[in-house]
């Protein structure tokens, strides 16, 4: 057996979504061993109306693209990154820890400075944006308010929801940015029209719209709240090994500064100007911190403080018609504001303090873009099934909030902050969850035999965790992992998936409990109950002339007497009168029983929708056994993430592949022939194969017993 699966590029993730490549055929006997498979502003000063940059023509252009998207070698936190020219010669080293550019929007012109706000320039329409995406293009967030500075080319944007995919940029600047002993590196990123520049000064346009980035030399203060540098002096070593000059169109894009004393990156400014296409100097606007503080502060209602010495709980009432509510404890009353006549920006943020606060929600609350932030432990309950929707919840580090409130259908609760949110409402929660940081523990209480904590769950950001505490808390197939993923801790519960929706290696299913879990991966491209089958009648035109239809559709006819059912195999069929129904290339006989015919139609749709291989890019970790039965459609499961479990993995029929993963480069279609692959490790107790083929492919390392029976095969390499 020597199977090769094609590599496919995903526009969603900007990289590889599948690859299986087996280069050598080695039959293996069962037994414990370590197995390895690897192959080896004057007239000359221009505001920037769109997005662009100029970079060196001597360095592979892919390097600048990878840099801006944290792809290739530019993973956040990486140090000692060697930069090479097109001939493979070292031209410099990035010594400081690589910045995390996730705070930069996919268009490059807006930077997240808190989970609910982003900054940019004002000119060229940047002060009037409607939305921005982070992580992947599909993670699109609506802007509800564009705050435009009256005296500066600066805008501050408020989002309708807390951003869960990205970590906001720090804006704390201490000391002088021009002090090269403190601020030892400056990086930028932007998107759009691009140029490469030769030493002669000749520039060549690179078509396409995409993020690029690079280094900038130590800036100087140039007055009018501006700092300046000359990254357009591309081959001057003072601009760093990846000099990147903001060209016409790079307005609003960020400049980051590395503080060697605090060992942190901070947002230094937003791009405003350059000195023309062939110029050298860029100007960045320093962030107007007082303006930012005042705008965000104005979006908060007064701080809510729980009096722990009172015998009374807080009572939260809300008048939806007026968009005004009250949170009251004894004679202490706090006024809050929510969505008013569809204006999400009318909703204010709420900040809660006071130890062990308890709130009883009395009315349904739509807080618009307003979010809740908890600095202390709180319990939020409802005695009358009231719901809450809004911008989301921030739970501060070291804080635990018990949340007994259900959401509303079609709306997601966005949770960020390093603290813990315990979901302990009652019955089926029609709302969804998006988590970007911290922990959410699910212990929803049962009502009407339903304890579904959320209708759907999306785990993103890389540092987030959803932990099951009660039974039947999730609909497994409605769990997905977004940008950089996070952890689903099944916590000793037995869980079955028919689909694994993970877009990158950050996704993880784990069991942290001492109670062993059984994880069943009964994967299917679709579920039968998701497939609708209608029965069409073959009319007289079809009888005499034939007709057109959709392959897979179910038809009925009494042409041969009692009702018979047929499945169409082609989009065009001939005359029934002339014997078309007997043509097995056009029709499949489905019998005379309607239920059996419908079931056959569903099975055919399941098979036809199956991909070449089921794929999981994430991790499987902890105290669990994993069972993979015979799968619907193409019974091949490729794991190119990693496995580290204390128990067994069992595969019935079909094929199982462990393999490494090609390094993802920004915007580049990967191939099996590329030289850079990431190693993956697979550690387990026993791999049990029953009439199944197992392949340990390139860049995969396995530690465990293999027990193969019933004509199973083992291939290494």
Please give the residue ranges for each predicted region.
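Solvent-exposed adhesion/ligand-recognition segments of exported proteins
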Residues: 4-27, 31, 44, 49, ...
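Tryptophan-rich substrate-binding surfaces of secreted polymer-degrading and adhesive proteins
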Residues: 530-606
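Chymotrypsin/trypsin-fold serine protease catalytic domain
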Residues: 154-245, 249
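Conserved H-D interstitial segment of serine endopeptidase catalytic domains
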Residues: 118-121, 126-165
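C-terminal subregion of chymotrypsin/trypsin-like serine protease catalytic domains
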Residues: 53-83, 106-114, 118, 122-124, ...
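Extracellular, surface-exposed repeat architectures
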Residues: 346-425, 466-531, 593-645, 676-686, ...
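Catalytic histidine site
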Residues: 82-136
């Amino acid at each position: 057996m020597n199977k090769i699966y094609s590599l496919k590029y995903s526009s969603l993730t900007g990289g590889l979504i599948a690859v299986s490549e087996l280069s050598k055929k080695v039959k293996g006997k069962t037994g414990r061993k370590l197995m390895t498979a690897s192959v080896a502003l004057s007239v000359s000063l221009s505001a920037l109306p769109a997005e662009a940059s100029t970079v060196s023509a001597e360095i592979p252009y892919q390097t600048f693209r990878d840099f801006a998207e944290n792809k290739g070698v530019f993973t956040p936190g990486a140090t000692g990154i060697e930069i090479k020219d097109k001939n493979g010669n070292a031209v410099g080293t990035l010594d400081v820890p690589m910045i995390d550019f996730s705070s930069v929007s996919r268009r490059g012109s807006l930077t997240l400075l808190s989970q609910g706000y982003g900054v940019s320039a004002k000119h060229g329409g940047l002060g009037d944006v409607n939305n921005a995406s982070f992580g992947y293009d599909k993670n699109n967030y609506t802007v509800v308010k564009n705050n435009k500075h009256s005296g500066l080319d600066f805008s501050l944007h408020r989002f309708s929801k807390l951003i869960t995919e990205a970590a906001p940029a720090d804006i704390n600047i201490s000391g002088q940015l021009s002090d090269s002993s403190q601020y030892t590196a400056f990086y930028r990123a932007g998107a759009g029209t691009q140029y490469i520049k030769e030493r002669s000064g000749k520039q060549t346009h690179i078509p396409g719209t995409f993020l690029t980035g690079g280094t900038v030399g130590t800036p100087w203060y140039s007055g009018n709240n501006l700092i300046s540098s000359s990254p357009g002096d591309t081959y001057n070593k003072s601009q760093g090994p990846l000099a990147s000059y903001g060209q016409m169109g790079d307005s609003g894009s960020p400049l980051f500064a590395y503080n060697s004393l605090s060992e942190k990156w901070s947002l230094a400014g937003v791009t405003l100007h350059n000195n023309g296409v062939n110029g050298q100097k860029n100007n960045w606007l320093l962030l107007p911190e007082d303006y930012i503080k005042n705008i965000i502060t104005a979006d908060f209602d007064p701080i809510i403080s729980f009096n722990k010495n009172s015998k009374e709980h807080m009572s939260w009432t809300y008048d939806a018609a007026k968009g005004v509510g009250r949170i009251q404890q004894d004679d202490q009353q706090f006024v809050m504001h929510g969505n008013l006549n569809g204006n999400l920006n009318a909703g204010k943020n709420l900040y809660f303090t006071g130890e062990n606060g308890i709130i009883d929600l009395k009315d349904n609350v739509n807080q618009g873009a307003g979010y809740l932030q908890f600095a202390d432990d709180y319990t939020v309950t409802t005695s009358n099934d009231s719901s809450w929707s809004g911008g989301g919840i921030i739970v501060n580090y070291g804080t635990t909030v018990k949340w007994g409130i259900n959401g509303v259908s079609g709306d997601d609760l966005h949770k960020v902050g390093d603290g813990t949110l315990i979901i302990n409402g009652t019955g089926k929660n029609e709302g969804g969850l998006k988590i970007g940081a911290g922990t959410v523990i699910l212990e929803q209480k049962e009502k009407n035999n339903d304890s579904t904590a959320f209708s759907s769950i999306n785990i993103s950001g890389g540092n987030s965790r959803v932990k099951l505490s009660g039974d039947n808390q999730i609909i497994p197939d409605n769990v997905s992992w977004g940008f950089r993923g996070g952890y689903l801790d099944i916590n000793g519960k037995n869980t079955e998936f028919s689909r694994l929706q993970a877009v990158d290696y950050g996704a993880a299913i784990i069991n942290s409990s001492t109670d062993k879990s059984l994880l069943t991966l009964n994967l299917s491209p679709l579920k039968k109950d998701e497939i609708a089958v209608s029965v069409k009648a073959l009319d007289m035109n079809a009888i005499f002339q034939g007709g057109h239809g959709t392959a897979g559709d179910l038809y009925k006819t009494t042409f041969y007497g009692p009702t018979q059912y047929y499945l169409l195999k082609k989009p065009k069929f001939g005359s029934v009168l002339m014997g078309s129904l007997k043509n097995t290339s056009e029709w499949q006989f489905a019998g005379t029983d309607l239920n059996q015919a419908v079931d056959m139609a569903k099975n055919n749709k399941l098979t036809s929708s199956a991909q070449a291989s089921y794929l999981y890019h994430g991790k499987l970790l902890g105290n669990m056994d994993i069972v993979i039965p015979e799968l619907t459609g193409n019974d091949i499961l490729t794991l190119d993430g990693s496995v580290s479990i204390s128990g067994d993995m069992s595969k019935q029929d079909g094929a199982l592949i462990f393999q490494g993963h090609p390094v993802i480069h920004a915007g580049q279609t990967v191939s099996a022939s590329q030289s850079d692959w990431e190693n993956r490790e697979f550690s387990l107790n026993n791999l049990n194969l029953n009439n199944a083929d197992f392949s340990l492919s390139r860049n995969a390392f396995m530690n465990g017993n293999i027990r193969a029976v019933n004509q199973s095969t083992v291939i290494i390499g």
